[in-house]
């Protein structure tokens, strides 16, 4: 479970998947890192969710030497080069070809909502914002009448 309280009192390595999208990442990490006193390892894995979030801050802290973490960046192109599409073809019983691989990759980028979303999802490049949406009703409710 991804509830911070569920980690309390446990031992062992922790993997936090899609960390950038976790609502209580700070509390989850606090509980997870407490396990490191017993030698546990904590792996924080995620697609980016903009630049303004705790996941991206941890990446920056590691890159700038403020934390003793290592950053591993794997783009879609890296995964393809390591055989991702070949594996997909094998598992789904489809024939592999360089042309099919290129068409598959190009289709993922082409069908993303926009270039920034594709770059974030497949290229490990965070968007300038997380894309939070405020409804018109919420905005109008906060406006001061003129």
Question: Residues of each region from the PLM?
Answer:
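Conserved RecA-like ASCE ATPase "motif II neighborhood" in helicase/translocase motors
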Residues: 1-34
């Amino acid at each position: 479970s991804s509830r911070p309280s569920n980690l309390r009192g446990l031992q062992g390595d922790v993997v936090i998947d899609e960390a950038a999208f976790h609502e209580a990442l700070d509390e989850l990490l606090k509980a997870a890192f407490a396990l490191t006193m017993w030698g546990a390892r904590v792996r924080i894995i995620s697609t980016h969710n903009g630049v303004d979030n705790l996941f991206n801050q941890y990446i920056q802290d590691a890159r700038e030497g403020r934390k003793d973490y290592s950053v591993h960046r794997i783009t879609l192109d890296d995964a393809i080069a390591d055989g991702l599409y070949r594996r997909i073809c094998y598992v789904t019983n489809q024939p592999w070809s360089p042309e099919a691989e290129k068409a598959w990759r190009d289709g993922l980028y082409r069908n993303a909502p926009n270039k920034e979303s594709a770059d974030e999802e497949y290229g490990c490049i965070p968007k300038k914002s997380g894309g939070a949406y405020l409804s018109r009703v919420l905005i109008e409710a906060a406006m001061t009448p003129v």
